[in-house]
Amino acid sequence: MYSNLKICVIGDGVHSKRIQKLLIQKKCDFEVFKPKSKKNFKKENLKNLKEYNVIFISSPDDTHYHYIKELYKFSYIFCEKPPCNNKENLKNLLKIKSKKIYYNYNYRFSKIFKLLQKKNKFKLGKLLYCNIIYGHALGLKKDYKNNWRSKKNKSPKGI
């Protein structure tokens, strides 16, 4: 069914594993490009990414802009949020006129969103106010200090 697609997943962390699992469930062939691997730092390997027609970017945040900038002309791109870490790169992304770039914004699949959709079922009346704080509490976990999100040069705004 998807045999004509050349799919690549950039990154091999938690979000990448979720995407890989979905691709396996859909019986899609794909390759994983691991940016931290020494062999993948070579420029010719980045050129090889241009051969794929679908690319999922789930690498560390500070790499997203670079991959988008290099690959958007060649592939459909699905990028985990955020697409960049600074205003200059954001301005440059806004200049790209492509209908082939998509960004993950998955709050619409959260349980609270589903509950809000069902509010009419219970005839509770109008929702007057709602304050939702959503996160994964990485800053509270033991491995946060070793995570790339705690490094100011890679994630200037933190998590």
Regions from the language model: what does each represent?
Residues S110-I159:
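Predominantly a Rossmann-like dinucleotide-binding segment in NAD(P)-dependent oxidoreductases
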Residues I7, D29-E31, I77, I101, ...:
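Hydrophobic anchor at the start of a short beta-strand
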